[in-house]
């Protein structure tokens, strides 16, 4: 499995091509404006069912306002448009389904979202976290601990997710309707999870997630320019999982044969709550906003906005502050059949290898290098 990149003079990705043997899984070319905003993405990706089953063409363009906020994403001719107020709150979204409107209070907290399909109302605690969402299906409840970390979500159907955190603030345990999953991290990156059907999943790190091993089976991640998982393949190059997202990470289509939580921008997706775990906070990709205030206050006065409303160029894996995604600079990556991963880029050491290492849930690991 191999991904090749070319770059322009500013370090922006110009082309991306991912191959499984001689077969092309992904092939894209990109264009940028004078401010470094990505304005076009054109190319193809393999169709689900195998690399010989045909290809899907993609032609995506992006338009921005003078503040760099995304105004329009046009995908194969279908347009999604956004409008914002002076504080950077999304006040309107228009797509093929119609118009969605958003209302806010004086604290930039979303209090109502009305779409052609539903009307949602939100309530907050004193620390600025959503504690209640009322919608057509019922009521969704959220709870937090003294550090204002989200500890419990009860959905409209009565399903419950509980989150537990270690002393450094990382989620080391997750309970979904009582089913427990434990996590091990390396330098803040997910290294291992254990709990689903008693199976252990080990992740192999490079420029993000490269592969995962579950039992004797090694599966490979294939990612786009935002490091979002597009495909998961097996060792023979057969596509097992396929994902599509809009610019803000809302799912446009998911097909899975393998359980996988690593999705948009390479981060953990919680299916039960439909949120992304971004360490300090949880992100709602449908609303394009965080569920809690930013205690760091690193990205302006709006404490809920995701990446300054420019998710095409930036991501926020810490939940504190946006960063360029991917960082400017050349990236090369590969994973061999043993599961050893490597990466090389400016100011970055050799890749981390978890080959042969078996940490315990909750354990901190030392840096192991090839």
Language-model-derived ranges and their functions:
Residues 1-21, 27-55, 59-63, 69-74, ...:
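Beta-strand elements of repeat-based all-beta scaffolds
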Residues 232, 250-252, 281-289, 301-337:
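Short, low-complexity export/processing leader segments characterized by acidic and small residues
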Residues 34, 59, 92, 100-106, ...:
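A motif-centric feature for acidic-aromatic and gly/ser/thr-rich catalytic loops and repeats
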Residues 312, 318-370:
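Low-complexity, glycine/serine/proline-rich disordered segments
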Residues 296-300:
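Short linker/helix segments within small regulatory modules
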């Amino acid at each position: 499995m191999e991904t090749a990149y070319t770059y322009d003079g500013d370090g922006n990705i110009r082309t991306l091509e991912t191959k499984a043997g001689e077969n092309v899984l992904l092939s894209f070319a990109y264009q940028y404006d004078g401010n470094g905003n990505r304005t076009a993405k054109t190319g193809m990706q393999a169709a689900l069912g195998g690399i010989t089953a045909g290809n899907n063409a993609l032609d995506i363009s992006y338009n921005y306002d003078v503040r760099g906020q995304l105004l329009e994403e046009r995908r194969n001719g279908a347009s999604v448009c956004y409008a914002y107020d002076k504080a950077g709150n999304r006040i309107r979204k228009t797509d093929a389904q119609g118009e969605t409107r958003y209302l806010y209070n004086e604290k930039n907290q979303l209090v109502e979202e009305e779409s052609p399909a539903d009307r949602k109302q939100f309530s907050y605690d004193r620390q600025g976290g959503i504690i209640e969402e009322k919608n057509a299906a019922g009521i969704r409840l959220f709870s937090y601990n003294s550090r204002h970390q989200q500890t419990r979500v009860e959905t409209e159907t009565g399903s419950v997710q509980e989150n537990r955190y270690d002393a450094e603030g990382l989620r080391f345990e997750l309970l979904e309707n009582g089913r427990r999953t434990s996590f091990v991290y390396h330098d803040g990156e997910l290294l291992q999870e254990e709990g689903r059907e008693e199976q252990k999943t080990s992740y192999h790190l490079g420029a993000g997630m490269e592969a995962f091993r579950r039992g004797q089976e090694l599966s490979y991640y294939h990612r786009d320019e935002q490091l979002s998982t597009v495909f998961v393949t097996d060792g023979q190059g057969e596509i097992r999982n396929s994902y599509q997202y809009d610019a803000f990470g809302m799912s446009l289509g998911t097909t899975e044969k393998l359980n996988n939580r690593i999705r948009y921008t390479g981060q953990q997706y919680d299916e039960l709550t439909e949120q992304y775990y971004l360490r300090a906070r949880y992100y709602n990709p449908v609303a394009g906003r965080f569920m809690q205030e930013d205690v760091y206050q690193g990205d302006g006065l709006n404490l809920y906005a995701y990446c300054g409303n420019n998710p095409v160029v930036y991501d926020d894996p810490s939940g504190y502050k946006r960063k360029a995604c991917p960082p400017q600079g050349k990236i090369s990556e590969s994973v061999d059949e043993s599961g050893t991963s490597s990466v090389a880029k400016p100011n970055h050491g050799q890749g981390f290898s978890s080959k042969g290492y078996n940490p315990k849930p909750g354990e901190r690991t030392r840096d192991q290098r090839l």
